[in-house]
Amino acid sequence: MKIAIRQPQAIYELGQRDNQEDSIWPLQGQATDQDFFFILCDGMGGHEHGEVASRIVSQSLAQYLRDHVNPEEIVSDQVLGEALEAAYQALDQADDEAAKKMGTTLCLLLFHRGGLTTMHIGDSRIYHVRPSAKKLLYQSKDHSLVYDLYQAGEISYEEMATSPQKNIITRAMQPGKDNRCKPSVVHITDLRPGDYLYICSDGMLEQMDNDALCQLFSSQDSDEAKRQQLIEATKGNKDNHSAYFVGIASVSSGEGDESLLDDEQTSKDNALNIRPVFEAEEVA
């Protein structure tokens, strides 16, 4: 499977905060249609040096993927686990008494011969939108207290956005070997031209719900116009808010692609033998 993307679009806004704790990769203004991975990290609010943690994780993960991943090949979950461990080790090396509480969320989009692999920790979101059907095909499950309460049936989906506990996350990347949170990993092979992949920090969701998001991506406007609409829709946000969205230009099959699903299953099975252990899913 060979996936071509359009020019990626980045949003990187300070909001009403004094400092920017979000980090994105590629850096704003540097992404091209030749990039094969996209990273977003949101430094944990209320924790010291959240901006340091988000920068360390995004940069160290990007460095590992650049050095060890060939997008023309199937990327195994074992490689992802090694990349994540490298990011955790970078956090450990930066750990000191002044920064011991630093932490960050993580979102990753990784395009490769096997399709798209997504990985996330925390409450930063990943979406797969199909404008031709005018619907969301996939939304990542937040690692947060309110999402756990929603799953347990104690609050409604709408109440998650207004709950006083909405900022409490249950997983984050932090230094210290006792703090190795597991990511959620999803493999997506049903990709079509015109689809969008969207990653965002929770700040982007203050004034943009799923219906509005789906409507925006389903419009006939250009990607640059969609980016400007997202910026306008989130202009009054209090929190830092950042995002990347990537449009699929084309999807084609090549020699050997008939064995991709078996290869992916083998990769996931092998991933169970490494640390951290993944929660992997297939999305048809």
Task: Locate the predicted segments by residue.
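PP2C/PPM-type serine/threonine phosphatase catalytic domain
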Residues: 1-284
